[in-house]
Amino acid sequence: MIRTPKHLNKRESVNLGAYYTPCYLVDCAYRLLKKHVSIEDYTLLDTACGNKEFLKLHHPKKIGADIDPNCGALIINALANPKRENYGINQDEPLIIVGNPPYNDRTSFIKQDIKNKDFTFEIDNDLKSRDLGISFLRSFAILKPAFICVLHPLSYLIKEANFKQLKLFKDNYRLLDAFVVSSKSFTKSNEFPIVIALYERGRMDYADIRRFIFPTDCDTTLCLNDFDYIANYVDKYPNAKKVGACVGYFFPMRDINALKRNKTFLNAPRENAVRISQDKLIYYQYIHYFKEIAPKIPYYFGNLDIIIENSAFLEIKDAFLKDKRVRLEYFKKLFQGHPCEFD
């Protein structure tokens, strides 16, 4: 069931990233937190508390704030001059930040028709990002809590470009524990992975994320280092300057979820097309067939690059292109141990 604030219309919900957090996910977040921390010794703060789902537990000191004046909480813009005193918290007070901060990627094609680009509120320059969720993570680092336990898109961590955008946050916090769940708990739009993430003081780099083993709600785990990716073998984005003799054109690729929505081979050249050289054609054919099985693999792969087992693929490449059964066996082995819906 999708739950949004009743006093907000659809456009306002999108612009504010305002989706309530189901109770079972709040409980999951606190279980994750309590595995590592005696929370009774800390003040709990949610700087985008919405309906205050994360603050309904019995706790000695809990503070909620939101930019929405109808939330019944402190009316504070968490992204403008964030500091502890805004919330009545002492500098030496043990602090844990909890919650489900807004997610709103203004560069996304999703819901562009209802996003209001004139919807603005003040954001400090060093917190600005194309995504509100990343801005919130940066703001948390300024408040210097001992722990941070929040929900956010898994793509903030597993996509290297997004990870680099974390800046101050990744330089001062490290991922301690995590649990991956589906966005279907919040929205009917394209499914993508969300992580309930617990951070502690420290620092992390992208190599740490690649090694991290993420438990999922499918009773499986996801580790980026367990797989090889098509970007190691082909260009994913326009490459006219790199390819001379061109044998075809391909739609640009972002991740597996984008591949589900978009075309593969193009009948005619486009300005933003990927140019295909003869020696790379086999890999683009691989991507074309990967698109067929993409809806059948678990949602938590959605923000990853197209996965390949290169040596195994090259051994069977001719049969792979000709025989659907060969392709099916290859993909079954590639995703062995994960709950797929192959025929």
Whereabouts are the PLM-identified features?
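Short amphipathic alpha-helix with an adjacent loop that forms part of the alpha/beta core around
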Residues: 75-95
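Short catalytic/ligand-binding loop motif for oxyanion handling, primarily in non-cytosolic enzymes
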Residues: 55, 72, 105-108, 156-160, ...
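Class I S-adenosyl-L-methionine
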Residues: 1-82, 316-317, 324-343
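Mobile active-site "lid"/loop adjacent to the S-adenosyl-L-methionine
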Residues: 107-129
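Conserved Class I SAM-dependent methyltransferase catalytic core
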Residues: 126-183, 197-198
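Amphipathic alpha-helical repeat scaffolds
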Residues: 77, 97-104
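C-terminal target-recognition/interaction regions appended to catalytic cores
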Residues: 245-343
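Flexible, glycine-/basic-rich loop-and-beta segments that form/coincide
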Residues: 190-246
